Amino acid sequence: MNGGMMRGNQMPNVTLTIQPSTSSMQNSQPRIMNNHHHPHNRFQREHVMPDVMGDGPGRRLRKNVANVRRHVDYVSTVLNHCENRLWQYGKQRILQQPDILYQQYAVPADSTPDVPVDCILTKFIRTAMNKVKCPVYSVCWSPEGKRLITGCQTGEFTLWNGTAFNFETILQAHDSAIRALKWASNEQWLLSADQGGYVKYWQPNMNNAHMFSAHKDEAIRGLAFAPTDVKFATASDDGTARVWDFARYTEERVLRGHGAEVRCIDWHPTKGLIATGSRDTQQPVKIWDPKSGSCLATLQEHKSSVMAVEFNKNGNWLLTGGRDHLVKMYDIRMMKEMRTYRAHKKEVISLAWHPIHEGLFVSGGGDGSIVYWMVDGEKEIGLLEHAHDQAIWSMKWHPLGHILATGSNDNNTKFWARNRPGDTVEDIFGLSNTNMIGHLDKEREPRMAPPKPSIETQETYRPDTFIPGMGLDEHLYEQLNRDHNMMTTDSTLLVPDDLTRQNFAPMIGAKRTLIKQPPAKKAQRQFERMWNNSKGIGAGSDDFTTMKGGLGREDAEGAQFGPSKSFLGPPTTGGSLLGPSQPRPQEFRSVPPPQQQQGPPPNWRHQGPPMSGPGQGYGPPGRMGGNQGGWQRPPPQGSYGGQGPPQGSYGGQGTLQGSYASQQGPPPRQIQHIPSDIDYRTAPSSSNGSTGDVDMRTMVPNQPPSGEPEHWRGPPPVSHQQQSQQQHPPPINMQRMDPRRDPRMLSGRSDQLSPSGPPPQQQQSSAQQGGKNQWMPQFEAGQNQNQGNYAGNRGGGVGGRGRGRGQPY
C-alpha cells in the first residue's frame, strides 16, 4: 500500500545508523542518524571512516599504563594553530613570547617552514631504560607517532609511549641482537633485521607475519624500502648489499664491489638509486642501480670507513658520516661534494634529516654527542656534547618534527624536545627556576608536609642573644638573608635590647617554627665560661648586696641577691647569655653576705636638697627610649625632694625615666625589676677610636691575684681634682652630666648609690679596689671568683658552667 498504510508486521522505513567511534574519539558518544526523511538514501550504505590512526600493538597491553609522568602535549598547539590559521594572515599571527605562559601559542614545525631553528631539540625530556640493561641498536617511530619502538641487543622489541614516554610493552622479537628497523611507505609493514642475518615482517599490531634468512650467519647492518614498497634492500657484514622482492621473499640482485663490510644503506626517495657505505677505505661510498646491480659512482672523499648514509627527501642531497669525524653532503646530480661539516671529536655513526625542514639535519657521534646542522652553513647551530655516555647507534625524528629519539650503546633511549617559551639554550635539563620556568612542573610535584613543631618551637619565641665581637650565629645569619625587610633598613641591626627587633619578633617566630634550631656553639659557651671566670666577683662584691630597697632574692639569712651589672646591656633572655634559668637557693647560701653599704659613691654629684634618712638607698635608673614595649617602670613610693623624678636628655635619645627616691621596706609586687645595666648603643666610648665591644684577643682569664689586676681596658687616670670630688661629691646635674661620671655607667656597686657615703671601714676597701669601680669592666682573679656571679649562676651550676646543670662539662 502507498501512503502511511503498512502491511502486517512491516516495520516503518526508518534507518538508524550508529557511527562507530574511532581511536581518536573513543570517549565520544555514538551518533544516531535519521535517514527516513531522505528517500534517496534508503538503499545506500552508511560510509564508515577507517581507523587511520593505527592503534599499534593492541589495547590489551595498555592496562598498566599510567600517564602521570611529564609529557610533551602537542595536541593543544596543533588545535590552536588550526583555529588561528582561519583568520590570521602573515604578520598577524601571534608571536611567541619568552614566557612559559605563551606555550599554548607554540606552532607546529610545519607551520614555520622559514624558521628551521625552532626545531633545534636541545631540551632533555626523559630517559627510557629496560630492566635488562643492554645497548640499543635501532629506534623507529610508529607512522602516526604514538609510540617508539626500540630494538636492543637481547632481541626484544620495547614499545614506549610517544607522549608520556613511559613503558608500554615488551616482546621477544629475535633470537639475536636487532640491528635495523624500517617502516614501509604505506605504514602497514615493519621490517626488522638481526645479528644472525634474519629478516622478519611485522604488522602494526606487532604480529609476526613472516621470517626468512637473508644473509647466512652474517649480521645485517641496514634496511631500505623502495619508494613503491615492492622491493627492499639489505646491507650485511659479508661485504654485499642485496635487493629483495617484498611479496615473494626472493633475492633479485646482489651488489658486490665493496672490499669490506657494508655498514649502511639507503634507497632514493623517488628514483631507482641505492647508496651504500662501507668499511672499505678505498671505496667508502657507492651509488648503485638496483635493476642491473651495477655501480654508478664511487665517492672517495672520506679517508676512513663510512658509518651512515641518508638521502634527503628532495632527492638531490646525500649525507655521509664516517670515522674521520666528518659529515659530507653530496649533490648526486653532479656527483660532487658540496660541503663538509666539522664539529665531532670522534666518528660519526648516525644521521637523520628533519621530516619538515629540508635543510636541517642531526648527527650522532661515537662519544655520545648530538650536533644540529643547516646545509648552508659549515658551523653547527646546536651542540649537545654529552647527550649520551657512549656511541649513538640510531636516531629518529618524530613525524611532526618536534621530538628526537636516540638509542645509544650506554643502554639508554633518550627523548629530546624543543625549548619551551622562556627556556634558554644552555638550560638543557630544565634546571632554571627564574621567571616562570618550571612553574607548572613544580605544581604537579608532590609537596612535603610541614614538620610537626617540637616542644622548643611551641614555646613563646625568645629573641636570640648577640655577643659583640663574636659575630652572628649561622641560623641567625640565614634568617636575616630570608627576611628582606630586615636587611633593607639600618634600624634593624641586631644589638642587645633592640626594640626594633622586638617588633619583628612575631615575624621571625613564624618562620622559626619550621626550622630545627641547631645547638649552641662551642665558641659561645666557651666565651661565657671565660667571661664568668675572668670577671672575678666574690664575697663582698657588687652582686651580693643587702640593700633594704634592693630588688634581689632573699636567702635564709636575710641577704638579697641582686642582678649582675655588665656592660653588655640588659640581656633579652632573662639574665644569661644562653637562656633564662632560675638560680638555686642552696648555691647562694654558701656565699657570706657582705656588710651593709651606705652613703653616696665617691664620684657622685648631688644637686638639690639632701636626702633624709641614713638608710635610704637608690633604685636602679629607669630605662631610656620612652614607653616602648612596656619597659617603663612606675615611680616608687616617695619623691626626689618633693619635685618628682628628675628628667633630662641623655645623648639626645629620649627622656630618662625613673626616680632616685628612698624606699622603705620591700618594694610593691607590681613593680617589675629593670636591671640597671649600660645601654651601650647610646653611651660614648672611653676613647675616640674605641667601639665599646669585647676584645677577645686581649682577654686574660684566671689571672693570679698578685700585683695589679690585668685589664684588657685600662682604667682612665685619676686626677687630683677627681680625688677631691670623690671626698666631697658635688650635687648631680642630670642635664649636663658626663657619661663617664654617670652612676648608671659605673660597675653597679650598691655602695655608690647610697647618698650618705660608705662607712669608714668600707671607704678603705673602696680605695683598695681603685680600678674595680671604673665604668669599664675589669678582670679579677681569686680563689672564689665564680661564687656569687649572678650571670653565671643563672646559666646553671657553680660558676656559670653548663646550662642548668650543677656539674662542670
Swiss-Prot record:
Transmembrane segments: none
Pfam family, one: WD40
UniProt feature, compositional bias: Gly residues: 614-629, 639-655
Intracellular or extracellular location(s): Nucleus speckle
Presence of keyword Zinc: no
Phenotype reported upon loss of the gene: RNAi-mediated knockdown in a sydn-1, eri-1 and syd-2 mutant background suppresses ectopic axon branches and synapse defects and causes sterility.
Key word Repeat present: yes
Similarity section: Belongs to the WD repeat WDR33 family.
Functional summary from the UniProt entry: Essential for both cleavage and polyadenylation of pre-mRNA 3' ends. Involved in neuron development, probably by regulating pre-mRNA 3'-end processing.
Stated name of the protein: pre-mRNA 3' end processing protein pfs-2
